[in-house]
Amino acid sequence: MELQVVGATALSVSETTFGREFNEALIHQVVVAYAAGARQGTRAQKTRAEVSGSGKKPWRQKGTGRARSGDIKSPIWRSGGVTFAAKPQDHSQKVNKKMYRGAIKSILSELVRQDRLVVVDKFEIDAPKTKVLVQKLKDMALTDALIITASLDENLFLAARNLYKVDVRDVQGIDPVSLIAFDKVVITVDAVKQIEEMLA
């Protein structure tokens, strides 16, 4: 199959990478796993066993008129332990390499079908100026875009840093969440070739 390159001839690409069927279930599983892996999982609370304090019975069982009480660390007391205390845990989910690659291919194929993948020969700016990048995107009628280059362009990266709906990545830095988060994905010809090699 062929992808249309802006201001140039069409680029011949692999059908298996850019012409796959949309696999919603696979993409969902990989995106959920990716988001789960980003969780810190460091939250922690103390149970009644871990709270500092005496284990002595505050008052005798009967005869005071007050509610019976075993120790001051009871969860129903102020400053007591938490009943079902949260503990640090690893939220990461296993995703096979084949599944991950399949999800990326499926997303790229859907971007092509929806005309959201914009292939350009090169995407460069002369200076790390946000104003310059905004104008370049404006000329292409883009406001919300992920820019993928073969290697990370420092000028582009610095210029896009302060733009809310623009991000710059190299091929190694792409992930399923970023690919579906933007209205358009601008990708260079060299980056397309790299992705094909990476996902082959």
Swiss-Prot record:
Pfam families, alphabetized: Ribosomal_L4
InterPro entries (alphabetical): Ribosomal_uL4, Ribosomal_uL4-like, Ribosomal_uL4_dom_sf
Annotated Gene Ontology cellular component terms: ribonucleoprotein complex; ribosome
Gene Ontology terms: biological process: translation
N-terminal signal peptide: none
GO MF assignments: rRNA binding; structural constituent of ribosome
Record region (Disordered): 43-70
UniProt keywords, alphabetically: Ribonucleoprotein, Ribosomal protein, RNA-binding, rRNA-binding
Function field: One of the primary rRNA binding proteins, this protein initially binds near the 5'-end of the 23S rRNA. It is important during the early stages of 50S assembly. It makes multiple contacts with different domains of the 23S rRNA in the assembled 50S subunit and ribosome.
Subunit structure: Part of the 50S ribosomal subunit.
Family, as annotated: Belongs to the universal ribosomal protein uL4 family.
Protein name: Large ribosomal subunit protein uL4
Organism name: Glaesserella parasuis serovar 5 (strain SH0165) (Haemophilus parasuis)
